[in-house]
Amino acid sequence: MPQSLHPGETSPRSGSTLWHALRAASPTVILMLALALGISDAMFTVLDGFLWRPLPYPHPRQLVLIRERLLKAGLKGTWVSFHTYAALRKGTPFIRSAGTVDLTGGPLTIHGVKHVAFGGFATPSLFRTLAVPPLLGHWLSRASGRPGGPEEAVLGYGFWKSAFAGSPAAVGERFRFNGKRFRVVGVMPRSFFTIYPGADFWIPRVLTPARMRDHNINHVMVARLSPGTSPRELNAWLKGYRNRALAAASPARRLRAEQDGFTIDAEPLHKGLLKIFLGGKPVLLFLLALIGLLLPLIAIVNSINLTLVRTRRRAAGFAVRRALGATGFNLFQAMLGESLVTLGGVILGSLVVAGLGCSLFRTLIRSALTGPVSIALPFTIRFGEFSVIYGIGTALLIVTTIQFIALFFAGRESLLGTLVHEAGERGTARAARFMRRGFGAFQVLMATVLVMVGLVIFQSLVNILHRPLGFDPTNRVETMVITPHHVSMARFWTEIAPALRQIPGIRHAALGYMVPFNNVMSSHSTIHTPARPNESLYVRTQKVSRTYFRTLRIPFVAGRNFTSAEERDHTAVVILSARLARRLFGTVDAIGRTFRPFGPRSPRATVVGVVGKVSWRATPATNIVGMMYTPLTYPGYKFGAGNVILKLSPGALNHLRRIRKALEGAAPGVAVTQMTRLNTLIRASDRLFLGITEITSVFALVALFLTIFGVYALTAQTSLNRHQEYAIRTAVGASPASLNRMAFAEGCWMLTLGLPLGVILALFLSHLLEGVLYGIPGLDWPVDLLGILIIVSTVLVASWVPVRNIAQADWSHLLKSGAA
């Protein structure tokens, strides 16, 4: 006689033993949820590091970047002029303190040993604004920022470790830089950074009266808001300040400011750093977050479906328990107890996947953002408390929800009959059929979005890798050369050019302020078209040797190269890119035209040549009109650093040490950085987009796999429930083609419901990415159609395989199993 059951108990046969719990756990559900939740956990850990984790400053929300921008001219950076800094530092009630910082670098001598170091010119008030206590010593004193003040320096943590072996005795030591002796007064902690996180040292920026009248917009200003002040209040005040300043300016200056779209505003420091480190495209983070969110949704739908299938098989047992007095809560407790193994497996697996994913994403992002130079990032990406809490919380919530949904459908008498009696006039009950098709359509929708967006990003990467460079990087190397303050680059090149020609293996050599795909140094200017309305254009400008174009094989579209006399005699001549020539003069044939490139008081320059378009970075900057090249001796601006580019013959890499020695011996105090192949620079600049493509591709493949599995599982379960019907149809003469049509009909229902919505959402996301990705139009029909074809073929094949297997089976056996 069978033993009676109390409400909520299980039978001895099924048991509430550990072995029964292990058998009740579905490895497929554990694998799917662990993989999807782990990837999602890793992705949200990245978002936490970039978006939600505060910067390592006291009260970081009070920090803002003040910026002057010429919106109509294309100047949209994060810089100000010293004139504006001096005016705002004392005259703004909403700013508690402020400071500026600029990048510098060069040869630095400590105890007779030369180092190549990059640092910052910082006003002493910058450290008080950021308010990070020093690790050793103290900040730059206020007196050091005044004319005639002490020559002080603060070291960065990394340089302190490498140059002074991390010794506390470094405080008080002296080093020579730019012809001056500086005394070390402090060392900053490892986590400290300004706008340039890799700085080795900071020395005081002395603001003389003449410098405070400088209107050139090329300095970084960080300000701390007064307590209780919001950036919106400061921006309202800055707008009024801008209007008052223009009202007091001359009519010509006021007109020019209006034509250029001159504005002054403040941006939170966190937001500004995101734009700087992500190439002005922080929307890429939200794209990855969206993709990371879709995977768990697909896995959840699959898990719900599998759990429902298992629950339907136990529907009779649930009915018996309900008849014996078990409540819905008792059944839920029993199912949840059986799911503890599943829950533990999902939590453990998701945390393992999340830890591996965080490590992978951190390495990938650091490599993508810093390139071949490893520097400290202002954002912390680590697997910590947030990741563990997120993983455990989401796993607990999702597994509990799945069990509740399964119990809701299988534990209620009204729905129990619907799910148990699936044999109806057309094979399945309406509710079960609707639920099955709804699950399938949702999976199709999510997979369509991931596959189509993944293909769009992949197409962008292909466009990047096959973009026209405008120069030849093969067998070219470059190195940055930094000269002492008193040695001009023109003089340096005069000394070194003959020596380089004597070294075997060097076919061509050149010097320029910038080299393509090296983002360490850049120079931009706002110039105006010579004809009215004198439109403002934001352009790249650089001084180059006359061998620059031949060394990089940059083709001339019109005109000629600089002559030796023009390079020697300070002649005001320029070479323009083809796009800039069209914007300035309306034609590429601009040879002999003249204009004033650096303002109405600058010398009038003559155009002697026009060259083709050159790619300078992984994705083109839409706000930069073109490039203007000038000779090394062009009158006006000076620079103390540049890039030497060498065209080497095969096998000449053995002479790099001799080349470096020649460069360092050209003038006393010259510093030379590591030599890098141009092809290496190009690959490094593509790493961000390559990494995003790799992540998206992995997500898309996982989503496609989950969709195939989900559609196959749905169709297989339907086929299993209808196998007797299929056997009868086969027995009375139905052809395999008719059964295949029935299977394809189920797949078409899923496609009809899910594919259109998925395509619409994917096209919408592609439209948002149009300004972020390279070479992607709003609609790319070949790529979009390929994505649709992949989804359609995947769903139809997954729908057809289970029916094919049943159609090939022995129909008499199917009839007997169905009768049983």
Predicted regions and their residues:
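Short, strongly hydrophobic transmembrane alpha-helices
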Residues: 23-50, 299, 344-349, 436-460, ...
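Alpha-helical transmembrane segments of integral membrane proteins
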Residues: 2-27, 272-277, 307-333, 337, ...
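Interfacial "coupling" helices/loops that link adjacent transmembrane helices in transporter permeases
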Residues: 299-343, 709-751, 802, 809
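Membrane-proximal extracellular/periplasmic loop immediately following the first transmembrane helix
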Residues: 11, 44-48, 52-105, 217-222, ...
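Membrane-helix entry/capping segments
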Residues: 2-27, 57-58, 242-294, 313, ...
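Small-residue-rich transmembrane alpha-helices
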Residues: 45, 265, 304, 340-415, ...
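Alpha-helical transmembrane segments of multi-pass membrane proteins
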Residues: 20-25, 329, 333-346, 350, ...
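Mid-to-C-terminal secondary-structure elements
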Residues: 119-142, 151-283, 363, 494-688
